[in-house]
Amino acid sequence: MNSKSSARAAIVDTVEAVKKRKYISIDEGTLNNVVEKERKFLKQFLSGRQNLRIAARVFTPCELLAPELENLGMLMYRFETDVDNPKILFVGLFFLCSNAFNVSTCVRTALTAMYTNSMVDNVLSMINTCRYLEDKVSLFGVTSLVSCGSSCLLSCVMQGNVYDVNKENIYGLTVLKEIILEPDWEPRQHSTQYVYVVHVYKEVLAKLQYGIYVVLTSFQNEDLIVDILRQYFEKERFLFLNYLINSNTTLSYFGSVQRIGRCATEDIKSGFLQYRGITLSVIKLENIFVDLSEKKVFV
């Protein structure tokens, strides 16, 4: 039975139930009100999602998108360039992972093969010149629509569930399996997992490079998350502080953490992402509720 048949059947049942209530005077106005309320409720129930969400639509060059073109539910960043045109670009998490130190050489090579054009090289060069990644790059949202043309139109959800315009398809969030971090003593033992994005920094060949992690944890308190991350990255923090002392730089923090949403533990699935003959192991956070919070930094 399809959704329309289910809706009609539910409305008929509602009408019959109302007629059985002898204390209610049944007239055309009352019946119409009941049916209309039931129809609105069913629309939400059948789609499984509320109508309220916050999303933004932006344009970005199609050359900067690769797996994002064919896979919705991808985390996007806003990049402020140092040039007048274009002043702002939008790039994906997979794009930034192609230059992250915590991604293996094999996966980094695969990502580089996905993004192959001169514009990608130019944008990566601009990002590498940033003192901190977050100086110019900030989280933007999760894609729910990609429309290609001379430029790509992106619809990104910043708060709410990720679904299409007709509310027929519910998307999750797709993340590289390599960058998943689960710091809980017993991971995934609670019904809800909170999702955070963590950026940290490390000296590599006398140069500061960034790393990106997606953290899954049952803890909601961000101060507690920061304490856990400090312990987890104890060695990296020591090396980073040593770099600060020897380089005479003005950098002030080792990393940052920002909550991007939550999802049910049972909705966390392992899978594969394929693009141009390249296959990557990913984690899919199905039915994620996006809720971008303020970024917190730590030393």
Curated annotation (Swiss-Prot):
It is found in: Virion; Host nucleus. Keywords: Capsid protein, Host nucleus, Virion. Its main location: virion. InterPro entries: Herpes_1 (IPR004999). GO terms for biological process: viral capsid assembly. GO terms for cellular component: host cell nucleus; viral capsid. GO terms for molecular function: DNA binding. Belongs to the herpesviridae TRX1 protein family. Interacts with TRX2, MCP and capsid vertex component 2/CVC2. Structural component of the T=16 icosahedral capsid. The capsid is composed of pentamers and hexamers of major capsid protein/MCP, which are linked together by heterotrimers called triplexes. These triplexes are formed by a single molecule of triplex protein 1/TRX1 and two copies of triplex protein 2/TRX2. Additionally, TRX1 is required for efficient transport of TRX2 to the nucleus, which is the site of capsid assembly. This is Triplex capsid protein 1. The lineage of its organism: Viruses, Duplodnaviria, Heunggongvirae, Peploviricota, Herviviricetes.
